[in-house]
A protein has these predicted regions:
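Fold-level recognition of mixed alpha/beta catalytic cores in primary-metabolism enzymes, strongest
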Residues: 1-104, 108-117, 266-345
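Active-site helix-to-loop segments that bind/position phosphate- or nucleotide-bearing substrates
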Residues: 145
Length: 345
């Protein structure tokens, strides 16, 4: 697969796996309407404070996930995978400067950090801030939480242990807005809604697979021995589906520039465009595009049709006219256009 950002060193890179993905929206509740924080503060539950405490019970400041049993399924990196990481250039200090951060969350290098399970806070909402801030206790607060899975972890298991953790913090889990009865029966309510897609597991090919070894040798020669081999990419792709069908290892060749602001408002594809421009100078162009043959058999296509087009506009009066007063007298552009098209086709 050709996907994802290249290594920050800009050297050729072969990636053997990706993390899985799952996510959920979490909402906790306080009073059934906004309350004045002076009149009711220190008495009424504050959903924003409750939410931050609940998140803090699940995720440490160094990124470690604190949920009991969360790492039970984790398959550790092999000696060969750890050696490949150790052999790759360490870019942490360069990234710290480039990204303008004081320090990373963890003392581990980036490649080790992204090989672990992750709990990412995608967004959080409650009251307003800045000029719109009010001295009020809000009725609810919400967070969107994304999970990155590593090999052997399953979405179903993680859902179970996370919900068990939330219950241990004293919350009753609901799936919709709370009813009056639920508010009266439970001191703490947490609405948990998991992504409708159901998530998907991680995938990682083995370093000692014969096909993987062959490809790494070829790319190593092409890169003059500077190829970086990475056990897993930090991002996610449902590659397990492809592997289940084809029964063959899946490898990833990153093509985008590492500083492409991926998933940001100004994401760009500079490195990908450079890579494709290099491909256009080759003697053989191979494009993966279009629908497969209707028989579902493998197909090699030797050509495509060309394409051209034009916009055609015809004109009538310089302003709209009443069709009763001017019909059958004024030229009608719609009729004229259909006649002209009919003369061509």
């Amino acid at each position: 697969f050709c996907d994802g950002p290249t290594h920050q060193s800009r050297r050729w890179q072969l990636v053997y796996g990706v993390r899985g993905s799952y996510g959920f929206n979490l909402t906790v509740y306080g009073p059934n309407r906004p309350l004045h924080s002076g009149h009711y503060g220190n008495w009424s539950p504050n959903p924003i404070a409750m939410l931050t405490e609940l998140i803090g019970s699940m995720r440490a400041t160094d990124g470690r996930i604190l949920v009991d049993g969360y790492h039970e399924q984790v398959k550790p990196l092999s000696d060969a995978e750890l050696a490949a990481i150790a052999a790759s250039p360490r870019m942490d200090e360069v990234l710290i400067t480039d990204l303008g951060i004081g320090a990373p969350e963890t003392e581990d290098r980036l490649e080790l950090a992204i090989a672990r399970p992750a709990m990412n806070l995608r967004g959080i909402s409650g009251g307003d801030v800045g000029a719109k801030a009010r001295n009020a206790i809000q009725p609810s607060a919400s967070a969107s939480i994304g999970l990155r899975l590593v090999p052997a972890q399953t979405p179903e298991y993680l859902r179970e242990v996370i919900e068990n953790h939330i219950r241990k913090q004293g919350y009753h889990i609901i799936r919709a807005e709370p009813t009056t009865e639920q508010r009266q029966q439970h001191e703490r309510l947490a609405r948990v809604n998991w992504s409708s897609s159901g998530g998907y597991p991680a995938y990682r090919a083995s370093f000692d697979n014969p096909l993987a070894m062959q490809i790494s040798t070829i790319l190593g020669d092409l890169s003059d021995g500077t190829l970086i081999q990475t056990p897993t990419m930090g991002g996610s792709l449902p590659l397990y589906v492809v592997e289940d069908v084809l029964k063959t290892p899946i490898l990833i060749l990153p093509v985008a520039n590492h500083d492409n602001n991926q998933h940001g408002a100004d994401e760009n594809l500079r490195r990908m465009l450079e890579t494709h421009s290099d491909l256009l100078t080759a003697d053989l162009w191979l494009f993966c595009d279009g629908p497969a043959h209707q028989s579902r058999r493998w197909q090699l296509v030797y050509g495509v049709r060309g394409s051209y087009g034009f916009n055609l506009t015809v004109y009538g009066p310089n302003r709209p006219l009443h069709s009763g007063h001017y019909g059958n007298w004024s030229p009608n552009p719609i009729a004229m256009l259909t006649e002209l098209i009919g003369s061509m086709r």
